[in-house]
Amino acid sequence: MSEQRDILKALAEVLEERRQADPATSYVAKLHHKGLDAILKKVGEEATEAVVAAKGGDRSQVIYETADLWFHSLIMLSACDAGPDDVLAELERRFGLSGIDEKAARNGQ
């Protein structure tokens, strides 16, 4: 397993543990306690911030905001009973497919 996958797996494990924590002491638990809509709102906010950073052209801000987006995406995946390995497996499945072929496979065409 690559170091990148290791850090994603380790972070996902910590986030899963924090999901069960006291919402008064854990940001992750607080988000889960508020429900999926609150998590999705936060993912949307972070996605917007990443887009704005990219538009601004500051590489360090793009990386910083993308890290926030990935962090909150991992929380979303957890809320949906999924994890980074599921997403990585899907990316591996798609690797080598053209976008047109991948879309056709999804649509059963």
Curated annotation (Swiss-Prot):
Q: What reactions does this protein catalyze? A: 1-(5-phospho-beta-D-ribosyl)-ATP + H2O = 1-(5-phospho-beta-D-ribosyl)-5'-AMP + diphosphate + H(+)
Instruction: Give the matching CDD domains.
Output: NTP-PPase_HisIE_like
Which Gene3D superfamilies would you find in this protein's record?
A: MazG-like
Q: What is its EC number?
A: 3.6.1.31
Per UniProt, the enzyme's principal EC class comes to: hydrolase
- Superkingdom, according to UniProt? Bacteria
| Single GO term (MF) | ATP binding
**Is Oxidoreductase one of the keywords?**
no
Classification via InterPro entries: HisE, PRib-ATP_PPHydrolase-like
Note whether Amino-acid biosynthesis occurs among the keywords.
yes
Task: Name the GO cellular-component terms.
Answer: cytoplasm
Which UniProt keywords are listed?
Amino-acid biosynthesis, ATP-binding, Cytoplasm, Histidine biosynthesis, Hydrolase, Nucleotide-binding
GO BP, sorted A to Z? L-histidine biosynthetic process
Which pathway does the database say it acts in?
Answer: Amino-acid biosynthesis; L-histidine biosynthesis; L-histidine from 5-phospho-alpha-D-ribose 1-diphosphate: step 2/9
The places in or outside the cell where this protein is found are: Cytoplasm
Recorded hits in NCBIfam families, A to Z, give: histidine_hisI, PRK00400.1-3
Please report which protein family the annotation says this sequence is part of: Belongs to the PRA-PH family.
Q: What is this protein called?
A: Phosphoribosyl-ATP pyrophosphatase
What is the organism of origin for this protein? Alkalilimnicola ehrlichii (strain ATCC BAA-1101 / DSM 17681 / MLHE-1)
